[in-house]
Amino acid sequence: MDLKNKSAVILLSGGLDSSTVTGLAKASKAKIFGLSFDYGQRHKKELDSAFTIANHFEIEEFKIVKLDLSLWGGSSLTDIKKDLPIDGIQQNTIPNTYVPGRNTIFISVALSYAEAINADLIGLGVNALDYSGYPDCRPDYIKKFQELANLANKRGREENPIKLWTPLLDLNKEDIIQLAFDNNVPLEKTWSCYSGNLEPCGKCDSCRIRQTAYKKWQIKKNEN
C-alpha cells in the first residue's frame, strides 16, 4: 500500500510487531500518530519502549491513553494473582495472557482518534501465523472489524472509510524481523516480554516466539 501523503494512527505497544509497522509507515513517508495504552498491565516497560520508538522515528504525535482493564482482570497480564504461562506455547488453546476484549477496545479508541484527526489508516501489528492463540489477531477478526468500522462512524457512512492496515498479518515472525532490519527498527529497544524485569525472562510465550523467530531468521540469513 502506498502511504505517501497519507496519515496513519498506529497502535504502538513498543514490541517487535508494532515497531516494525511504524518503521514501514515511516519508510513509506506516512504521517504517523502513535497510540499506546496504559491499561493496567503488569509493567510499564513496553510503554517506555513505545516512547523510545516514537522518538526514534520522529513521529508527528504520540499519545498514551489511560484505560485500566485491571479493574476486572481476566488475564495474567492484568491480574498479578494469575501466573504467567512458562511451559511453552500450547496449540489450539487461548492462553491466560489473552486480555478480554483488548484489541476490540484499542482499535475502537484508535478509530475515534483517527476520525477526529482525519487520518486515512489505522496501523496494526497483528500477525496470524505466529500469534499466541489470541482470537483478536486473526484475519477473520480484522475483516469483520473493518466491516464494523465502515458502519460505525461518519467517514464510513460517507464512503471514505478509515482502513485497517495490517502489513504483517500473513508474515512469519522471522520475516517480520527481516522487515524490521530493512526499515531501521532498533530491535534492541523494543520489548516483547510479558515480565517487567530488567532483562527479558526468556520463558514466557512472547519471549519464546521471539527467540524462535530470531533463530530461524539467522538460519535464513546464513543460507543467503
From Swiss-Prot:
It catalyses: 7-carboxy-7-deazaguanine + NH4(+) + ATP = 7-cyano-7-deazaguanine + ADP + phosphate + H2O + H(+). ATP binds at residues 12-22. InterPro entries: QueC, Rossmann-like_a/b/a_fold. Its cofactor is Zn(2+). Belongs to the QueC family. It comes from Prochlorococcus marinus subsp. pastoris (strain CCMP1986 / NIES-2087 / MED4). Catalyzes the ATP-dependent conversion of 7-carboxy-7-deazaguanine (CDG) to 7-cyano-7-deazaguanine (preQ(0)). This is 7-cyano-7-deazaguanine synthase. Signal peptide: none annotated. Transmembrane segments: none annotated. Binds 1 zinc ion per subunit. Zn(2+) binds at residues 193, 201, 204, 207. One of its GO terms (molecular function) is ATP binding. Pathway: Purine metabolism; 7-cyano-7-deazaguanine biosynthesis. Gene3D superfamilies: HUPs. Keywords: ATP-binding, Ligase, Metal-binding, Nucleotide-binding, Queuosine biosynthesis, Zinc. GO terms for biological process: queuosine biosynthetic process. Its EC number is 6.3.4.20.
